[in-house]
Amino acid sequence: HPVKPKDSASLLVLRQGSACLEVLMGRRGRKAVFSNAYVFAGGKVDRVDRLAQPASDLLPDLGQRLSSDPHKARTFAMAAVRETFEETGLMLGAPGDVGETGSESWDEMRALGLAPDLRKLAYVGHAITPASRAVRFNARFFCAWEQDMTGELGGSGELTELAYIPIEDALKLKMVDVTLFMLEEMLRREDNGFATPSS
């Protein structure tokens, strides 16, 4: 029997570099799933991500693309924001109250008087790990702009070599297929002139 995929969410933090679009990536540790691969910040959706309250909600059309259940759609987005905060130190936040969750990461955000600013998220894509794999993810990918993030780049150390990398250069790094597909999708959008913060 194929393993049931776990819900997960990732966030591509983008910035307009001097020559081209850059994306925040880091390297997974040797013992991690996808060991030594370059990835975006992200991870499994936790139960606490359902309890946490955002400062602003997803744009309606984005929510509908994620799931017919608005609560489930929001939970994916909340997980992407939490994982990015844990792994990079950067938070897509606005003044708000996350509420009682019993989660260290959410409590940290709450102490700062911030909650996820979900209206700043755009949707990149969805991927499910093939049935033949031992570890499987049902993954949603979002993107947001660096200028909308607060905090200092650092994080828990789960990702090393954290850096903004020009997307063309990132394509040459060691990564799993789905990471590559999402980078290619961002390049397509850039070629089609999708709205950058400076435009």
Q: What do these predicted regions represent?
A:
Residues 1-199:
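N-terminal leader/linker segments that precede catalytic domains of diphosphate-processing enzymes
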